[in-house]
Amino acid sequence: MLFRSEPDNLDSYTRSRGALTAADAKAFARLLTARAHAAGMAIAQKNAAEFAPAGQSLGFDFAIAEECNVYHECGAYTKAYGARVFEIEYPDNGGVENYQAACEGRGKRISIVYRDRAVVPRGRSGYQFRGC
């Protein structure tokens, strides 16, 4: 598959005050993964680490794990997806020390990126990017 997608806010049910359930989120995930695959795209699970054990059965091909070092969710993603995890750590939540700890702990097994949240273009003030 050449193209990739990563729908965000799979965990919206946790903030919906009962309007959405975990079952609703999983049903929506199945719809999105089916559509992505029909279009020839790979699709990532993003957020809702509690769904990681069922992620592949929901149709996800890999995971985008934001701040999993901060929230101690990395193990759930790597257990479910193996090396098919892309971890992103941010300067405003744990800083470079957190990123370095992530690299030391998992950097030889998965891709880890340190990036500014605003995705500032290279050469502009505020741009931050590292990878391990």
Language-model-detected regions and their locations in the chain:
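Short, small-residue-biased leader/transition segments that mark boundaries at the very start
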Residues: 1-2
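Short, well-ordered beta-to-alpha junction loops that form the rim of enzyme active sites
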Residues: 8-10, 47-48
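Surface-exposed substrate-engagement region within the catalytic domains
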Residues: 22-132
